Amino acid sequence: MQLSMSFLIGFGTLVLALSARTFDLQGLSCNTDSTPGLIDLEIRRLCHTPTENVISCEVRYLNHTTINLPAVHTSCLKYHCKTYWGFFGSYSADRIINRYTGTVKGCLNNSAPEDPFECNWFYCCSAITTEICRCSITNVTVAVQTFPPFMYCSFADCSTVSQQELESGKAMLSDGSTLTYTPYILQSEVVNKTLNGTILCNSSSKIVSFDEFRRSYSLANGSYQSSSINVTCVNYTSSCRPRLKRRRRDTQQIEYLVHKLRPTLKDAWEDCEILQSLLLGVFGTGIASASQFLRGWLNHPDIIGYIVNGVGVVWQCHRVNVTFMAWNESTYYPPVDYNGRKYFLNDEGRLQTNTPEARPGLKRVMWFGRYFLGTVGSGVKPRRIRYNKTSHDYHLEEFEASLNMTPQTSIASGHETDPINHAYGTQADLLPYTRSSNITSTDTGSGWVHIGLPSFAFLNPLGWLRDLLAWAAWLGGVLYLISLCVSLPASFARRRRLGRWQE
């Protein structure tokens, strides 16, 4: 009995350890090559209380439908190669890859020799220009919807497809490729509904908000009209209490001034214009993580995106189980393993195939559902930090005392024991920790600008030797011609002065 109990306990502990090691960390796998979704971020809805000032409105709007449409995707690229030939067989080549936007029949392979290409008194060379055109034609399925963006593609961004292009049966995408399909005319049905909306009373213009649309609309005489929606609210003033008028003699001078200014300040804050400007300004410039804000605002944890002029550009992702790998390279994002492949987990929880570089020895505190601490180039996996917010209710005096609990000790290490110091110096006055909140950030710390480790991929000794010998032969030939030109006049003068050689 005791043996069986110990076996069960050991087996359960092993299962828990394996499950914790395998499924403890999750990342977002996102296809950003697909068409993103566009959504208007109505920040003013933050000021609306769903249970107060509720009114009934008649709403007339167009329904949205989505259908699948077969199409043919054509992508053509033209490879331009120009090869130069000079003395002693030395050559160089220029390679350019351009998008070809013409017809498939016009995508021809040809070569045009130019001989001589360039020739002057010290150098001659010829050139051959070769253009190779390649096209890939693929049968695909796209989704057509009655609201913009009108077309969704999983293989490219089809946001630029217009209604006219849908009706014509051909569209050119932003990357230069083309789509051909059966012409399609967008049609929408009109829907009439009675919805409960929340009206904002403390505003110069009455604003009604609907949770079904996640939008707010400014009412003019109780109605709002546009090409896609009509809103009519009859009793839009019944739920708003009238403002009380007070006179100067009722209060003191200071109180009267505050009383007169309070409605203006209240309108400014409750209209959320200031809050909207701050939020869109911060998240629209890339200073902070727009994906985190979009997840909280749209109440969807599995999306990424950014904000452009108050419009959220959003991609749908799905969660996958990943595991940390040994951080043995100079990468800013930690390496993770997913299905046997190496990826990098950025600060927004997204799996990437590339990453900015970072200084070896840089310590990073990261949040992936839990706090983790990792060191760049340490060869060790990031470790979890045990942190409980409820146990950190510090009094200020206790908090200050907890910062320096031991005397400062300087551990000096020379270049022989610490190669990082040999490469970068001690860097004692710089912040060793860092965090990044931008999807494109390469900043690796406060006050420290990262320039990256040198890359030695350009080292090619055999190529250098070939070029050196070629130029040495060319220079030797030129010097021989110069010496010949200098010696010939002297030889002719000597022959004229001494005559022919006779025995």
From Swiss-Prot:
List the Cytoplasmic topological domains. 489-503
Q: How is it modified after translation?
A: Glycosated; Stabilizes it.
Looking at the UniProt record for this protein, which Gene Ontology cellular component terms does it annotate, in alphabetical order? host cell endoplasmic reticulum membrane; host cell plasma membrane; membrane; viral envelope
Segments crossing the lipid bilayer: 468-488
The residues on the Extracellular side of the membrane are 23-467
> Where does the secretion signal sit in this chain?
1-22
Region of interest: Fusion peptide: 274-315
Q: Give the record's glycosylation annotations as residue positions.
A: N63, N109, N139, N192, N196, N202, N221, N230, N235, N321, N328, N388, N438
**Gene Ontology terms describing biological process:** clathrin-dependent endocytosis of virus by host cell; fusion of virus membrane with host endosome membrane; virion attachment to host cell
Matches recorded under InterPro entries:
BDV_G
- The UniProt site entry described as Cleavage is assigned to R249, D250
Entry keyword set: Clathrin-mediated endocytosis of virus by host, Cleavage on pair of basic residues, Fusion of virus membrane with host endosomal membrane, Fusion of virus membrane with host membrane, Glycoprotein, Host cell membrane, Host endoplasmic reticulum, Host membrane, Host-virus interaction, Membrane, Signal, Transmembrane, Transmembrane helix, Viral attachment to host cell, Viral envelope protein, Viral penetration into host cytoplasm, Virion, Virus endocytosis by host, Virus entry into host cell
Say yes or no: keyword Cell cycle present: no
Lineage: superkingdom? Viruses
**Pfam family for this entry, one:** BDV_G
Annotated function: Unprocessed envelope protein p57 is thought to be involved in attachment of the virus to its cell surface receptor. This attachment induces virion internalization predominantly through clathrin-dependent endocytosis. Envelope protein p27 and p29 presumably linked by disulfide bond are the viral type II fusion protein, involved in pH-dependent fusion within early endosomes after internalization of the virion by endocytosis.
Report the protein name in the record. Answer: Envelope glycoprotein p57
What organism is the protein native to? Borna disease virus 1
